Curated annotation (Swiss-Prot):
Localization, UniProt: Cytoplasm
Gene: ybeY
EC number, as in UniProt: 3.1.-.-
Binding site residues for Zn(2+): H125, H129, H135
GO molecular function: metalloendopeptidase activity; RNA endonuclease activity; zinc ion binding
Keywords for this protein: Cytoplasm, Endonuclease, Hydrolase, Metal-binding, Nuclease, Ribosome biogenesis, rRNA processing, Zinc
Organismal lineage: Bacteria, Pseudomonadati, Pseudomonadota, Gammaproteobacteria, Chromatiales
One biological process term in Gene Ontology: rRNA processing
Predominant place of localization: cytoplasm
Annotated source species: Alkalilimnicola ehrlichii (strain ATCC BAA-1101 / DSM 17681 / MLHE-1)
Name under which the protein is recorded: Endoribonuclease YbeY
Length: 166
Protein backbone atom coordinates (compact mmCIF):
# COMPACT_ATOMS: atom_id res chain seq x y z
CA UNK A 1 0.00 0.00 0.00
CA UNK A 2 1.30 3.44 -0.89
CA UNK A 3 0.99 6.08 1.81
CA UNK A 4 -0.91 9.23 0.96
CA UNK A 5 0.47 12.72 1.37
CA UNK A 6 2.08 13.26 4.80
CA UNK A 7 1.94 9.49 5.40
CA UNK A 8 -1.77 9.73 6.22
CA UNK A 9 -3.72 6.49 5.82
CA UNK A 10 -5.58 6.05 2.54
CA UNK A 11 -9.00 7.67 2.42
CA UNK A 12 -11.61 6.44 -0.05
CA UNK A 13 -14.15 9.25 0.07
CA UNK A 14 -17.22 9.46 -2.13
CA UNK A 15 -19.13 12.75 -2.09
CA UNK A 16 -22.62 12.58 -3.58
CA UNK A 17 -24.40 15.85 -4.34
CA UNK A 18 -28.10 14.96 -4.53
CA UNK A 19 -29.50 18.49 -4.71
CA UNK A 20 -30.80 20.64 -7.54
CA UNK A 21 -27.89 23.07 -7.15
CA UNK A 22 -24.18 22.91 -6.31
CA UNK A 23 -23.33 26.60 -6.17
CA UNK A 24 -22.09 27.49 -2.71
CA UNK A 25 -21.69 23.88 -1.57
CA UNK A 26 -18.29 22.74 -0.32
CA UNK A 27 -16.10 21.03 -2.92
CA UNK A 28 -14.90 17.47 -2.45
CA UNK A 29 -11.45 18.75 -1.42
CA UNK A 30 -13.00 20.51 1.60
CA UNK A 31 -14.86 17.37 2.63
CA UNK A 32 -11.62 15.38 2.30
CA UNK A 33 -9.75 17.83 4.54
CA UNK A 34 -12.46 17.81 7.22
CA UNK A 35 -12.87 14.02 7.17
CA UNK A 36 -9.10 13.47 7.34
CA UNK A 37 -8.75 15.81 10.31
CA UNK A 38 -11.55 14.05 12.19
CA UNK A 39 -10.15 10.59 11.45
CA UNK A 40 -6.67 11.54 12.66
CA UNK A 41 -7.87 13.23 15.85
CA UNK A 42 -10.42 10.48 16.48
CA UNK A 43 -7.65 7.89 16.59
CA UNK A 44 -8.37 6.11 13.31
CA UNK A 45 -5.01 4.94 11.98
CA UNK A 46 -5.84 2.59 9.11
CA UNK A 47 -7.35 3.08 5.69
CA UNK A 48 -10.87 4.47 5.68
CA UNK A 49 -13.79 4.43 3.28
CA UNK A 50 -16.94 6.48 3.66
CA UNK A 51 -19.53 8.38 1.70
CA UNK A 52 -20.91 11.86 2.29
CA UNK A 53 -24.30 12.43 0.70
CA UNK A 54 -25.47 16.05 0.41
CA UNK A 55 -29.27 16.06 0.21
CA UNK A 56 -32.28 18.38 -0.02
CA UNK A 57 -34.99 18.83 2.63
CA UNK A 58 -37.24 16.08 1.26
CA UNK A 59 -34.58 13.37 1.48
CA UNK A 60 -33.29 14.70 4.79
CA UNK A 61 -36.79 14.58 6.25
CA UNK A 62 -37.51 11.09 4.88
CA UNK A 63 -34.29 9.62 6.28
CA UNK A 64 -34.71 11.33 9.65
CA UNK A 65 -38.27 9.98 9.82
CA UNK A 66 -37.34 6.45 8.72
CA UNK A 67 -34.29 6.04 10.96
CA UNK A 68 -34.98 8.30 13.94
CA UNK A 69 -38.77 8.62 13.95
CA UNK A 70 -38.57 12.41 13.61
CA UNK A 71 -40.62 14.03 10.88
CA UNK A 72 -38.37 16.92 9.91
CA UNK A 73 -35.05 17.30 8.11
CA UNK A 74 -31.99 17.38 10.37
CA UNK A 75 -28.50 18.68 9.70
CA UNK A 76 -26.46 15.45 9.72
CA UNK A 77 -27.20 11.74 10.02
CA UNK A 78 -24.50 9.13 10.56
CA UNK A 79 -24.88 5.54 9.43
CA UNK A 80 -21.98 3.45 10.79
CA UNK A 81 -20.95 0.42 8.75
CA UNK A 82 -21.82 -2.90 10.35
CA UNK A 83 -19.47 -5.72 9.40
CA UNK A 84 -21.08 -9.05 8.52
CA UNK A 85 -20.87 -11.71 11.24
CA UNK A 86 -17.80 -13.91 11.13
CA UNK A 87 -15.60 -11.42 9.33
CA UNK A 88 -12.04 -11.99 10.57
CA UNK A 89 -10.34 -8.95 9.06
CA UNK A 90 -11.46 -5.39 9.65
CA UNK A 91 -12.67 -3.54 6.58
CA UNK A 92 -11.89 0.12 5.88
CA UNK A 93 -15.59 0.96 5.54
CA UNK A 94 -16.72 3.34 8.25
CA UNK A 95 -20.20 4.17 6.97
CA UNK A 96 -22.11 7.05 5.47
CA UNK A 97 -22.94 10.63 6.39
CA UNK A 98 -26.05 12.36 5.08
CA UNK A 99 -26.00 16.14 5.32
CA UNK A 100 -29.04 18.27 4.50
CA UNK A 101 -27.74 21.35 2.67
CA UNK A 102 -30.75 23.64 3.31
CA UNK A 103 -30.66 22.87 7.05
CA UNK A 104 -26.91 23.57 7.23
CA UNK A 105 -27.38 26.87 5.41
CA UNK A 106 -30.31 27.92 7.63
CA UNK A 107 -28.52 26.99 10.87
CA UNK A 108 -25.36 28.86 9.85
CA UNK A 109 -27.41 31.96 9.05
CA UNK A 110 -29.42 31.75 12.31
CA UNK A 111 -26.28 31.20 14.39
CA UNK A 112 -24.26 33.89 12.61
CA UNK A 113 -21.57 31.40 11.56
CA UNK A 114 -19.76 31.20 8.23
CA UNK A 115 -21.43 28.44 6.21
CA UNK A 116 -18.14 26.70 5.47
CA UNK A 117 -17.35 26.56 9.20
CA UNK A 118 -20.73 25.01 9.96
CA UNK A 119 -20.26 22.45 7.17
CA UNK A 120 -16.85 21.56 8.64
CA UNK A 121 -18.32 21.18 12.12
CA UNK A 122 -21.11 18.88 10.96
CA UNK A 123 -18.72 16.71 8.92
CA UNK A 124 -16.36 16.40 11.89
CA UNK A 125 -19.31 15.64 14.19
CA UNK A 126 -20.63 12.98 11.82
CA UNK A 127 -17.24 11.32 11.33
CA UNK A 128 -16.76 11.10 15.10
CA UNK A 129 -20.10 9.29 15.31
CA UNK A 130 -18.85 6.84 12.66
CA UNK A 131 -15.81 6.25 14.88
CA UNK A 132 -18.06 5.40 17.83
CA UNK A 133 -18.21 8.71 19.68
CA UNK A 134 -21.58 9.74 21.09
CA UNK A 135 -23.19 12.52 23.12
CA UNK A 136 -26.14 10.86 24.83
CA UNK A 137 -24.68 11.13 28.34
CA UNK A 138 -23.24 14.40 29.68
CA UNK A 139 -19.72 12.96 30.00
CA UNK A 140 -19.81 11.63 26.44
CA UNK A 141 -21.07 14.97 25.13
CA UNK A 142 -18.32 16.85 26.93
CA UNK A 143 -15.62 14.55 25.54
CA UNK A 144 -17.02 14.61 21.99
CA UNK A 145 -17.50 18.38 21.96
CA UNK A 146 -13.98 18.88 23.31
CA UNK A 147 -12.56 16.75 20.52
CA UNK A 148 -14.65 18.63 17.94
CA UNK A 149 -13.31 21.94 19.29
CA UNK A 150 -9.70 20.73 18.98
CA UNK A 151 -10.20 19.40 15.45
CA UNK A 152 -11.91 22.58 14.28
CA UNK A 153 -9.27 24.78 15.93
CA UNK A 154 -6.65 22.82 13.98
CA UNK A 155 -8.58 23.72 10.84
CA UNK A 156 -8.64 27.41 11.82
CA UNK A 157 -12.33 27.36 12.78
CA UNK A 158 -13.76 29.06 15.87
CA UNK A 159 -15.34 27.08 18.71
CA UNK A 160 -18.85 26.31 17.37
CA UNK A 161 -20.26 25.72 20.84
CA UNK A 162 -19.10 29.08 22.15
CA UNK A 163 -21.06 30.72 19.34
CA UNK A 164 -24.12 28.59 20.22
CA UNK A 165 -23.96 29.79 23.84
CA UNK A 166 -23.91 33.51 23.01
Amino acid sequence: MTAAVNDAPALDLEVQYVVAWRAGLPPEAAFRRWVSAALAAGGHTGPAALAVRVVDKAEGRRLNHDYRGRDYPTNVLSFPFEAPPGLDEPLPELGDLVICAPVVEREAREQGKPEADHWAHLVVHGVLHLLGYDHEAAEEAEAMEGLERRILAGLGIADPYRLDEQ
